[in-house]
Structures are given as C-alpha cells and as structure tokens.
Amino acid sequence: TPSSQFTRAPQATDGCVAVANPDLERIIRTVEIRTTPVLIGKNLSWVRPDKLASQKKQFSETLQTWTNAKRNGRENELLQFYASDFSADGKDLNSFSMSLRAELKRPGSKPASLKDISLIRWSDEADTMVATFGEIPDGEKVGRTVRQYWQHRPGGWKIIYEGLV
C-alpha cells in the first residue's frame, strides 16, 4: 500500500490479503515468519484446547498410522489415506502415487519421523484439518516441511492435498 494510502479499496488486492502498514509491522514483530499460521474467515470461534482433546487424539492416531505406513514403505496402505479427488501441484492421485512409489523405493532413502506438528481444524462445507510438520529422515538434523489438507469423509480422514512449505 502506498504510504499516502492507509487502506485499499475493496477488491483492489486481486485475491491477495492486504494489511495496513501498522498492522503488518505488529505482525512482523509478533509472529515467527513461515511457522505461524494465518487464519482468514468470516466467523472464527476459538475453542478451549481441553474441549478438543479427544478429537486431536483421534486425528493424531490417524496421522501416526500414515507415518508408520510411510516409514515402513507400505505403499498400498499409505495410498489408502489419499482421497480419490486428491490434487497437489497439478498432479492428480494417479500421478502423485507414482511419485510417492518412486520416493519409497529410492535407494538410500531413510525412514522419517515427524517433528513440530501443527494442526488446524475447521468446518464449513467440509470438516477439514491442516497438518504441517517437519519430516526428518532418521539420523539427520533437518528435513523438509510438509503441509497436508485432510477432510473427514465416510470411512475416516483422507488427504486431499499434500505439498512442501
């Protein structure tokens, strides 16, 4: 935003989020860039963590089962976690599954553990969970940061998107 203009006209951002300079300066001082999630919505309702404990436990068990399937190279079990309408970076489930199979069979690839798991859940048209985590190969100190979008579907949670942050 130009310094002479405090706010932008409605719909002048072409789909981007516009924040007034003083607010942006406060955000920069307050949050850790690339690790603090930003939620944008019409109606946000904060819920006490203890009210969500059982739901978090149930989803965490699902995520751990996904992790175990990937760690152990069980590709058929792993692919059961992905929704039929999955898409990621222009790949449908079929294309993505070929990449995933190649990753699992790559010589020298090490099993990985999840670290710094962040979960954000909301319900609008669908019950959605965003899981962001570090995927650290065993014996390494650093890895990659993965973000997955899961939706609760008949039969359980399914991944509808997966990509690197």
Predicted segments with their positions:
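Surface-exposed, charged secondary-structure patches
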Residues: 99-147
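A mature extracytoplasmic/lumenal domain signature
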Residues: 23, 31, 42-44, 82, ...
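Exported/periplasmic cell-wall-interacting domains
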Residues: 1-64
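A structural boundary/capping signal
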Residues: 48, 70, 112-114
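Short, well-ordered alpha-helical segments enriched in acidic and aromatic residues
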Residues: 72-89
